Amino acid sequence: MNLRTIARKNILGNLQRYVAYFLSCVFAVSVFFVFTSFIFHPDVNEDNIYGGSLVKTCLSAALVVIIVFCIFFITYSNSAFLQARKKEFGLLTLFGTSKQQLRKMIYYEQSLISLAAIAAGIGAGLLFSKLFFMIMTWMLSVKVPISFAIVPKAFVMTIAGFLILFQTLLILSLGRIRKLEIIELIKSAKKPKSLPVYSKWLTVLSLLCLGSGYYLSATANAIDMMFRVFPILILVLIGTYFFFTQSSVAFFRMLYRKKHSFYKGTNIIVRSNMIFRLKDHARMLFLTSVITAVILTATGVIYMFYSDLQRQEEQSIPQSVSWVEKDASRFQVMKPETAENTLKKAHAVITYKVDATGIPVTFQSDLPYGNKKMEAEALLISEKVYNQVAKEKGFPVIHLQENEAFINVSFQMMVKDTFGEGETAAFHMKSGKTLSYVMKKQQNKGILMSVDGVSRLLVVSEKSFDSLSQDVPLKEQMRMVGYELEHWQETVDVSEKLENMVPKEHTSDFQTRAPSYQIVKQGVALMLFIGLFVSVLFFIVQGSMLYLRMFTEIEDTGVQVLALKRIGVTDKEIHSILGKQIGFLFFIPFIAGTIHAGFAYAALSNMLNSNLFLEAVIVIFIYFVFQALYYIVTRHIYKRAVLQRM
């Protein structure tokens, strides 16, 4: 019997241990192959797909993420496989197998698995690539459907890339074998574990880091997040690592000392197993909780943004079709009757119309950070105009005294209150006249379109506006015209037609909502679709890590279960013990990852000024369902494997 035959028999003998790793590799290869096939598909070009280069860039970024994650996962798995088989390697060495022969045998085993994974992954990729192309055709509104094609470059990149990856990481891991002595290999599984210890200072540090990271995340707006994202990431990672290596030990030692509950039922066995294996599990729990947080945060944030996209568009572009005439005495951008006739011919229904004038003013505003001032611009309008649009949009109306005013900003992200409530502010007209108002609370509502980047409206009482407008010639005022359309999402064609009717020198003064909404929606939907693929890969890999960890301890668990049965522990109690131990590994990282993601969701809600609680619950619930199913299947396989060894 040669080494290749032994390698094949070893794979079949350790099939339960290898299956999760193999399937994870197959999925990674298949996703890589499908994405590569799309990127290099002859039909994927700018002529056929609007924004085709952007799509390719997104998919290429996803490929980099997959490769980096595969490096991490394969390295971890190879290390776990070698650790689990130390005793077997020690016995083979004792019976005369040289370290060179041992390394060859392991090399053959891993090479067979990697070649099979590449072949199966490409086969699965070919099988599902047509479905992927159909989905992408629908999502990207492709002019000519993307046909099924065998892309040679995808084959070459997938086979060459993963062969190099598997072989390089395998050779690096084999270097560990020659450093181990026979006695260390044989006794590796027999080394007694001492009660784990912890540092009080590191325990406090973990809680402080997590608390600080959560606080920074929960209180951040869009401007803050630009500066806080890396500190939050570092604090949460440090806090999570020391939470599992230190704080969890402190918590379980506290449970260990509670004798009234420690000796109740099977708690003595479950808690003892958990605390004595905690140091072994700490790194894996840290990694899987971080992976869970990444999956929930990435998928959740994109899904929440997608769900809130329509409201964001209606906020930033207040009317479906709108424009500003910088000389209110005439129409240079477009005549209202021209727009109305075009909309009528396209069977677009107008729900309300805005035709209002405003007076440009300037004021001194604080920079977002620091104590410096800058000159800013605003458009002074009447509360009558504001309330007209507010009623149509379902916003509360506001009534002002003659000396009162407030600032309205259409953008809710990157917004800092311009003035404090009750503050007296000065505004300057072009004529040199200075206006003074007591400022009411700032509103961030989508009322009228921004004018040349001027997003602030200064809303004053009707009486005050009428008095001021009498002294300002109409040609020095600005006119804002806008139309809100029924089912505006379906008005892309007429919106683009109106855009083409605007003189080139006035294109920046004209705004439509439907075309930009469809482009952004398409981009976010693509990100969500790609993100789901990558998230599923992360989820499978995370589950594989848990599965692998349990099967590396299966021999010790089998010995323990046999001892428990001999002292009278029932089958029901043994099933309960195993279920709790597996549940701990599956759901503690889930809880930690969910908490991390929850604060990321809170930050996004603050940034968008929107309640995204329902979307967060949906994402977390879906993930929990898949995690629970994975747990049930793994528990069944693991219990059966343990009991078969008795």
From Swiss-Prot:
Keyword annotations from UniProtKB, A to Z: Cell membrane, Membrane, Transmembrane, Transmembrane helix, Transport
BP-aspect Gene Ontology terms: transmembrane transport
Membrane topology per record: Multi-pass membrane protein
InterPro entries in the record: ABC-4_Integral_Memb_Prot, ABC3_permease_C, ABC_permease_BceB-typ
Domain of life according to the entry: Bacteria
GO cellular component term of the entry, any: plasma membrane
Keyword ATP-binding: no
Keyword Secreted set for record: no
UniProt xrefs under Pfam families: FtsX
Transmembrane regions: 20-40, 54-74, 115-135, 154-174, 203-223, 232-252, 285-305, 523-543, 582-602, 613-633
Similarity annotation: Belongs to the ABC-4 integral membrane protein family.
Protein name listed in UniProt: Uncharacterized ABC transporter permease YvcS
The organism of origin for this protein: Bacillus subtilis (strain 168)
Lineage of the organism: Bacteria, Bacillati, Bacillota, Bacilli, Bacillales
